[in-house]
Amino acid sequence: YLPMKVVAERQEISPKYLEQILRLLQSEACEQAGVTDEDIFNRYTGDGGLHGLRRSDYENYNAFSAAKKELENGQFFTPPPLCEMIVSALRLTDTDLVADLTCGMGNFFNFLPNERNAYGCEVDPNACAVARKLYPQAHIVQGDIRDYEPQTHFDFVLGNPPFHLRWIMPDATVMTSHQYYCLKAAKLLKPLGILAVIVPASFLADSFSDKGAIRMMESRFSFLGQVMLPEHAFSDSGVDGFPTKLQFWQKKSTAADRAPKRYSTDCADIYIPSGHPVMAASA
């Protein structure tokens, strides 16, 4: 399986061009129009890149995010170089079952060793249509993560869930979307399965104020570690300077010889060579 090539500079896409792509997808006429899968992969950005708002026009990210939420679903697709870096670090095999529970256009899937073992859920019908076009052998459903119930369990769950959406749970408690993503992953992972998830740097950052959420995670996972991501990691999607981190968790096993590792708020700085595509976004 050969992944699609990522161009050095992904071009901005206009709403008009997006509408044309979606019409071609609906009519299955992309090939006739000369639009290749690589064209779609390198130019489709989703709601997060089409909101028409500029981060620089707002005093802080929270103000920018509040305005953006009125137009979209907090949707910023994970940049392909970052997806490739995460997948490479996990050293997946072609027999591993891998899920992205809010897969967007499926950028993580482009770097998996076996597309047939990829599973995804995406609430936005347009992004889901793009993902299905690019990865026809993957198992991709259109729907809400809260309703996603695949008939299998996974070796790995990867993800960049929406940030700071607040969802009311059946028991009337309120939970952030990224915390819910982690708990849903725990339900769907095999014992000792790995969760690699991008979250805001503020998630579980304070051992006192976040102790309830930390206990909730520790009841399901053994903590493996976390690293800060470059602040410009999502600049291609219109957000620059918003701190995020990458966390790794391993689902607990009932085996007596498996002592879970407790969570630590320590967060390492990831080393990325200056020539790596993830760093190129700052240029």
Predicted regions and their residues:
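Conserved Class I SAM-dependent methyltransferase catalytic core
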Residues: C121, P125, V174-S235, F242, ...
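Glycine-rich phosphate-binding "P-loop"
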Residues: E70-L71, P170-A172
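Conserved beta-strand segments of alpha/beta enzyme cores
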Residues: N117, A138-H139, S222-G225
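Switch/connector loops and helix/strand junctions flanking conserved nucleotide-binding motifs
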Residues: H164-W167, A205-S207, D236-G238, A256-R258
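Flexible, glycine-/basic-rich loop-and-beta segments that form/coincide
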Residues: S235-A283
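Conserved proline-anchored active-site loop of SAM-dependent methyltransferases
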Residues: E84-L92, L97-N114, G120, D124, ...
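Conserved phosphate-coordination/catalytic loops
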Residues: F76-P81, A172-Q179
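Class I S-adenosyl-L-methionine
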Residues: Y1-L134
